[in-house]
């Protein structure tokens, strides 16, 4: 624990670190590999500069641990993982391994944190349009909480559950921020569309939703399809078999 305060041994508690490492290394059942760190508190930052500040503070918290490691277990590693900091920070002194879990896809949350451009988001959910209501600039999609989760982002006083894009031949076109998923029920979502886009969708069309939190989408939806139509299988849990 280098600052997140979710769980784990505090990085500065070298007494407990030493006891655990010695116990693990002397067991016939285990091998001491090193230290696993997730700085999830960077997700609470309000700006890119604050993300870097939190990251640098975590590195400082790890400095004594690194010195201890070099003296007692020099072959062990320090493994660090959090996508916001690993996307924009430059200093990774004394870190042996980086594991940014959301680096491959990104999402709209990462964009608003300052980790990436919206064009870097590499995942979208294709949702069928089930109803259109141009009189109130809204469409209803088959894409609700069970498909998109209920994670949300608030920007400029507006809370949304996904950004909107139009499907093209091999990718998608992201619409302006005033077009967004404004409300979710279990199976359906309500999407606000500006006047210039509301009449471009009919029931049965597909609309692309850039998720707020892409880590949750594959477990909710199953297989993925790339922009060339290839199916990408994901790891599944099998119970009672």
Feature map (PLM): residue ranges:
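Short amphipathic alpha-helical surface patches that serve as generic macromolecular interface elements
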Residues: 59, 126, 185-188
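Active-site loop ensemble at the mouth of alpha/beta enzyme cores that anchors a bound cofactor
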Residues: 84-166
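Structural motif corresponding to alpha-helix initiation and N-cap regions
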Residues: 14, 18, 123, 174-175
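Active-site loop/helix belt of alpha/beta enzymes
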Residues: 2-117
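Generic structural hydrophobic/aromatic packing signal, biased to beta-strands
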Residues: 24, 78, 98-100, 129, ...
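C-terminal accessory subdomain/extension
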Residues: 134-241
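Short Gly/Pro-enriched turn/cap motifs at secondary-structure boundaries
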Residues: 58, 118-120, 179-182
């Amino acid at each position: 624990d280098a600052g997140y305060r979710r769980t784990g041994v505090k990085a500065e508690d070298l007494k407990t670190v030493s006891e655990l490492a010695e116990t693990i290394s002397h067991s016939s059942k285990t091998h001491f590999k090193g230290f696993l760190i997730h700085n999830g508190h960077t997700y609470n930052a309000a700006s890119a500069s604050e993300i870097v500040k939190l990251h640098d503070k975590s590195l400082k918290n790890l400095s004594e641990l690194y010195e201890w490691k070099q003296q007692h277990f020099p072959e062990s590693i320090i493994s660090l993982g959090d996508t916001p900091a690993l996307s924009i920070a430059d200093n990774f002194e004394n870190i042996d391994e980086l594991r940014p879990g959301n680096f491959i896809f990104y999402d709209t949350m990462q964009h608003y944190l300052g980790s990436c451009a919206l064009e870097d988001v590499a995942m979208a959910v294709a949702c069928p349009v089930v109803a259109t209501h141009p009189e109130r600039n809204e469409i209803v999609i088959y894409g609700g909480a069970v498909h998109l989760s209920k994670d949300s982002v608030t920007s400029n006083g507006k809370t949304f559950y996904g950004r909107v894009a139009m499907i093209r031949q091999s990718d998608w076109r992201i619409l302006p921020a005033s077009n967004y998923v404004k409300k979710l029920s279990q199976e359906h979502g309500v999407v606000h569309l500006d006047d210039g886009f509301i009449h471009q969708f009919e029931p049965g069309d597909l609309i692309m939703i850039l998720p707020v939190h892409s880590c949750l989408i594959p477990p909710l939806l199953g297989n993925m399809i790339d922009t060339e139509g290839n199916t990408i299988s994901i790891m599944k849990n099998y119970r009672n078999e």
